[in-house]
A protein has these predicted regions:
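Basic, amphipathic alpha-helical/coil surface patches used to engage anionic, phosphate-bearing ligands
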Residues: 1-305
Length: 305
């Protein structure tokens, strides 16, 4: 049950919802390419498929796409620990030892992409939030190549989460992750569902409030262990079996998704070459990451009174 590429019908639906067309997209890409050639600090190495998905994910705003293209190359300088030296075999090989993450293979009827995080390790010592964040951004890069959707619905299974997991997660890391996810990859979070909400949910929400913008905080929903409230928002076919759905076994879905990366290992590693040259940035132009995406880049740990 491999993650499916968008069907022609889904592509048409997404474009209709955004009020755009094949011709509009071609023109937009030409405009962006012309703009990109005028940016001495930015590489030219981004294909039309990624530009098209940026345009779609930015709701067809050319100015937002320009900001995102800048951030796509510039944020590698600011967050090399997240965006450089990304060997999928190494990152995924470590990540799968302590957590399972994957997208559901089909889009929802409204062309949203559901992603699932589950099976977090019981021992916080085995949990590595930096590796997990790198895996999330690998997925974001893959989606920029392949996906065609109107936004993301995230299911986060909190079973096994303890205070140690929360305290080990840095606020700065989450802020950087969110900024890259939204700014460079233009992903739009439509809902965050915390299922099997644990006793430390208050600590988790403290982290969420500290790290995420208010707009996203308002889209957070929690579901108690044993409840079916998740299915008030999603059909069971969009949820893996282990969480009460009928979408298939989580590990099988995850393994199918992992296989998507193996032919792209060299491509991911080659992307390290394509980074902004900040010494060439025009003096009257702010960095894309500072134009609406500025945050403290330090990876501070969460402090709870």
């Amino acid at each position: 049950m491999k993650t499916g590429l968008p069907t022609p019908e889904q592509v048409a639906y997404v474009r209709k919802q955004l009020g755009t067309s094949e011709n509009d997209i071609r023109v937009a890409i030409l405009v962006i390419r012309k703009w990109l050639k005028m940016q001495p600090h930015l590489p030219q190495n981004i294909d039309d498929a990624r530009l098209e998905r940026m345009y779609i994910n930015c709701k067809c705003s050319l100015e937002r796409v320009k900001t995102s293209v800048d951030a796509y190359f510039s944020l590698k300088n600011r967050y090399p620990e997240l965006l450089m030296n990304r060997n999928p075999r190494e990152i995924i090989g470590v990540c799968k030892k302590f957590i399972t993450m994957f997208p559901m293979p089909r889009l929802t009827d409204s062309c949203l992409r559901v992603s699932v995080t589950t099976n977090i390790c019981e021992n916080p010592d085995d949990y590595d939030p930096l590796v997990m964040s790198k895996a999330i951004l690998l997925w974001s890069e893959l989606m920029l190549r392949e996906d065609y959707s109107l936004g993301d619905i995230m299911i986060l299974d909190m079973k096994n989460v303890q205070a140690g997991h929360v305290l080990k997660t840095g606020i700065g890391l989450l802020r950087g992750l969110e900024m890259i996810y939204r700014g460079a990859y233009c992903r739009r979070i439509k809902a965050l569902h915390f299922v099997n909400a644990p006793k430390v949910m208050d600590m988790i929400m403290t982290l969420v409030r500290a790290a995420l913008p208010e707009k996203i905080r308002k889209r957070v929903m929690t579901h108690l262990p044993g409840s079916n409230t998740l299915f008030d928002h999603l059909p069971r076919s969009m949820v893996p079996n282990e969480l009460g759905g009928t979408g298939g076994p989580a590990e099988e879905l995850a393994e199918d998704h992992r296989e998507r990366y193996w032919p792209l290992v060299d491509w991911f590693m080659e992307q390290d070459q394509f980074v902004s040259n900040e010494s060439m940035r025009p003096h009257n132009m702010t960095c894309g990451m500072e134009n609406g995406f500025s945050v403290d880049g330090s990876f501070k740990k969460l402090c709870i009174d």
